Amino acid sequence: MTTTETTFAVSGQHYLFNVQTFAHTVLALGGDAYAYALRDRTTQGVIDDVASGKSELGVLFQTSATADEVNAALDAAGLEFVELIQSAPRVALPASHPMVNAASLTLEYMEDYPYLYFEQDEDSPVAFAEEALAGVPRAKSIACTDRASLSELIVALNGYTVTSGILVGISDGAGLNTVPLNTDVQLHLGYVVRKGEQLGETGQRFVDTLKKNLERYARF
């Protein structure tokens, strides 16, 4: 078996818009042969991949409450965050959920329902969570490492998660809806790169496409 060197790679948190942007980029580039990589990672995994050069850039978000801590970690790793858009957090829940038709929700309204979230590395701070307001205590919570599993469990258990307002592909085929979350916290979505390094042509194309997707589907 011949190992082909990867010529372009992106690491990111578990957002489906990463996948769709990557697909759009590959299709636009075309070509008879290529070796690319798209890596779903924990927040620390995204930082490590970009800092080591394994990926050219990493897609992640920070909130108005976690930005200082996340940016400090990025700075220590020799990285910088480039914001593309701000968005409002939303509660993602199944179409059959009793709260699905609410005009807006608070986390108090969701206390009786299972909370699904993406598991982070054991020693990662709460600020590295992929969900806004992750530090709020929940009586029922389930950690997942896979996007499809999280979506399916939300439906099967009548649970919920807190996601971005970027609705493109949010259901992942699982039939999820989103409702605005009543909070002052804002999401800052963007990408991380190594300090002082410019993106290559493919990386810039990815970022340009990502920005268009985010602007098109963001909810405020």
Which residues fall in each region the model found?
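Flexible hinge/capping segments at coil-to-helix
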Residues: 73-89, 93-115
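Secondary-structure junction motif
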Residues: 18-23, 65-67, 107-135, 200
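N-terminal winged-helix
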Residues: 2-49, 198-201
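A late-sequence structural motif
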Residues: 29, 177-220
